[in-house]
Amino acid sequence: MNSIKEIKEFINTNGNSEGCLENFIDEHYEEFEEIDFNYVETLETDERRWYIISTVVYEVYKNNMLLGYLAINEVTTLKSESSSYSDLFVDVEAYEVKKIVKESFEIIK
């Protein structure tokens, strides 16, 4: 996989109830061997009774070269010690995102 689009499509095609990105990568290790995901920020969260789903933005690197950014909709918190990700039937979903940099100014007195 050499582009954000390829990675996004692979995740969305194969994201069958692993629940979180880490489990998904473990399940598909060979495909993600050269890919690194670095946490950037959490965009939103949806709190459920037994778990929390968040949309998390990651920088995506291949061989230390930035490919771009992906937002991953995934389970970020299990509230019950007796639950596992496979109990939830939550698919990992990926979205392309772009970084927006805001610039502001402050008066110096």
Give the positions of each predicted feature:
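Acidic, low-complexity, intrinsically disordered interaction modules
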Residues: 33-90
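Acidic, proline/glycine-rich low-complexity IDRs
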Residues: 79-109
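Short, low-complexity interaction segments enriched in Ser/Thr/Pro/Gly
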Residues: 5, 60, 95-99
